[in-house]
Amino acid sequence: MAMQLHAASPDSEHYVAKSPPPPPPLSPHPEPAPAFVKPKSPHVSQGGNAPVATATTPLTPGRVDRARHDHHGGGGGGDEATQLLNGIVLVLRAGAALLSFVAMALVASCRHGDWMDFLRYQEYRYLLGVSVVAFVYSAAQALKNFRRRRRGAADASFLDFAGDQAVAYLLVTASAAALPITIRMRSAVVNVFTDAIAASIALGFLAFAALALSAMLSRHA
């Protein structure tokens, strides 16, 4: 026991003092924390786990069509404007048919004998023929437009535009041809014959205006 105490005594010449371990060196530039690496694709699974869920909304066919329609037409404004134009064209053609029918009836009624007979004048015969053509064409076009609107089919076509222009040209030429002779007649005498012819000429000009406007609108529709 005495020998063990002697060996452990610090006065012993065999005693060696143990120094504490030195502290770790301090780095002047501490290493930054590892940055978070974002996966390349949200649909690629990491470590064999389930695919990562995303918040994207799938595009259904209805949404795709709506997006295309909004890009090109800006909503339903284009369709409403087209329907409005087609309705105006229908009214104009129906009005042209009515005006042409009344003008045709007035000219055909001018058979009062002697010089008060429209058959004696080439201008009035031409006016009657054009009024018949305008009435048949305008009534047929109005009926066709009405049926197509009920079916929801496409309305305007190049043939409709060209037909409106052609019949409108016939109406204005016939009315203009009958106007000078009628003015001369009315300067001499005013009676039922000259009044009926003057009214039919005025209706011919109105029918021309209706078909000309219909041609312009049908092209834009």
From Swiss-Prot:
Region listing for Disordered, in residue ranges: 1-78
Membrane topology, record value: Multi-pass membrane protein
TM regions (residue ranges): 88-108, 126-146, 161-181, 197-217
Subcellular location: Cell membrane
Cystine residue pairs: none
Low complexity bias spans: 50-62
Keywords: Cell membrane, Membrane, Transmembrane, Transmembrane helix
All ranges on the Cytoplasmic side of the membrane: 1-87, 147-160, 218-221
PANTHER family documented for this protein: CASP-LIKE PROTEIN 4A4, CASP-LIKE PROTEIN 4B1
Family indicated by similarity: Belongs to the Casparian strip membrane proteins (CASP) family.
Name this protein carries in UniProt: CASP-like protein 4B1
Species for this entry: Hordeum vulgare subsp. vulgare (Domesticated barley)
